[in-house]
Amino acid sequence: MKLLIIIASILVLVFLLGWIGLQIRPRPFSPYPEQTGEIKTIPLAAGLPAPVERFYKTVYGEEIPVIDSAVMKGHAFIAPFGVKLPARFLFVHEAGKGYRHYFEATWFGMTIMKVNERYVDGKSLFEPPVGDPIIDDASTNQAANLAVWAEAAWFPSIWITDPRVRWEPVDDNTALLFVPFEDKMENFVMRFNPETGLLDSMEAMRYRDAGPQAKKILWITRNVEGKKIEGSKLNAIGSATWMDQGLPWATFTLEEVHYNVNVSEYIRQKGP
């Protein structure tokens, strides 16, 4: 009996230690050395669907910034294996064209998992923590292209400054956003908050897995009310959910952002 109590106590302590380690946020990445570049503006275009026009007037007013690139850093919780892990992230975007991601998941602030991925020149690269890299896979390319446009929720002017993009009305609080992918267009269902006018969520059919047998799953990204991007009305917190899982697999909190910086080389690198 005494031995069982000792074993149970050890198991409880191990579990508690593991849980405590997952509550500690990692230190942020070093600040990006280049400051936001010159940002030009264009007038808000006429003829947008009503909720879209309301959104842009709420966020920007009548003058819309032209964003060509973005470097974004922050903290996250990710659950790639069903266990919520604290993490830090780096997103580098060439607006409307490509990106790279770097994640570090941590335990007691120590890195236990690294992930590099990018989508540049229409080709994806995903380096999982375990296994071989996935390179220029058709399903992964489609998923990555949707991420290009979904992550633009942190610089949404690209959805009207890029001439390839178009909007279609649905109702007072919903519109369809059509974005280019290879030789065709794909679309998001964009849902806006009727009270604030801000974007609540984006929905699209997206591949989660690689390979020819992969199937599209409803993918939902949500803006989370609370912290705002400094100097703006845009939410700094966002989540991503696969419909068949029901709960977010990732929640990101943006803490540093620089727009219109030179990312021509940085977007092709790996690591922080």
Regions found by a protein language model. Give the residues of each.
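N-terminal leader/targeting segments and the immediate start of mature chains
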Residues: 25-71
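Flexible, processing/modification-adjacent segments and terminal tails
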Residues: 126-182, 213, 270
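Short, exposed beta-strand/loop patches in secreted or surface proteins that constitute
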Residues: 89-95, 117, 163-170, 190-191, ...
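Short, hydrophobic/aromatic-rich segments at coil-to-beta transitions
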Residues: 66-73, 95-102, 170-178, 200-201, ...
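Gly/Pro-enriched, hydrophobic low-complexity segments
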Residues: 176-264
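Hydrophobic membrane-insertion alpha-helices, especially the h-region
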Residues: 5-23
